[in-house]
């Protein structure tokens, strides 16, 4: 008997994948967690029935949420990841030699635990001595931080359940306070096909807080529509004004200096969402 998984991404649209086997399933204190092995995308993490990451295409998301802000900042030393319990963002952050400390704050320790077990190529850097892993509420962690981080990345789930407050204006105001005077933050902000209001509202909220605010995109096959947005807010450094000499060699599969620049070239319908 064949086993197929379908993520219903809207009421009329979804993505379906053939499953080899279920690796782990558990109702944590915060969400339904499933690890499955797929035929096409390798091992896959699902939270509340939604695809979070897969072994085959994870590099796109993790490279784009990290390298864009890290190359924009001239000397990032202390970096915070809110969410991101799979460890992929941490893996990419540590490719930057200037980084002295990377802090990861995820509310659900089970995501961290089972990512280490079933997604070892993604979670491979979580034991690095430069990494401080905290199982805690990212919203509260931000509220208790001030002038501490060079770069903050919000690697959250969809805006439902415990992650909903990570898409609110008050959270972005807290991030601004938690950043140093030339700090940068980036958040994944869903897709512009099915969640246009979210993309628009987050961008406008961030723009009212950060003097430099931009939106960029990446192509991620297993995410809704395959087109994903990231909103970046910066106090001083413009991601479109990065000097060519700042780009150093990092081992990537998607991100390049050309991709860095091209990601900010938006289709007209996405530009219109930001007006």
UniProtKB/Swiss-Prot annotation:
Disulfide bridge partners, by residue number: none
Cross-referenced SUPFAM superfamilies: S-adenosyl-L-methionine-dependent methyltransferases (SSF53335)
Tagged with keyword Metal-binding: no
UniProt cross-references to PROSITE patterns, sorted A to Z: PABS_1, PABS_2
Keywords: Cytoplasm, Polyamine biosynthesis, Spermidine biosynthesis, Transferase
Domain of life: Bacteria
Enzyme Commission identifier(s): 2.5.1.16
CDD domains from the UniProt entry: AdoMet_MTases (cd02440)
Top enzyme category: transferase
Enzymatic reactions: S-adenosyl 3-(methylsulfanyl)propylamine + putrescine = S-methyl-5'-thioadenosine + spermidine + H(+)
Major place of residence: cytoplasm
Boundaries of every PABS domain copy: 2-235
Residues annotated as the enzyme's active site: 155 (proton acceptor)
Molecular function GO labels: spermidine synthase activity
Coiled-coil segments: none
Summary of the function given for this chain in its UniProt record: Catalyzes the irreversible transfer of a propylamine group from the amino donor S-adenosylmethioninamine (decarboxy-AdoMet) to putrescine (1,4-diaminobutane) to yield spermidine.
Protein name: Polyamine aminopropyltransferase
UniProt organism field: Shouchella clausii (strain KSM-K16) (Alkalihalobacillus clausii)
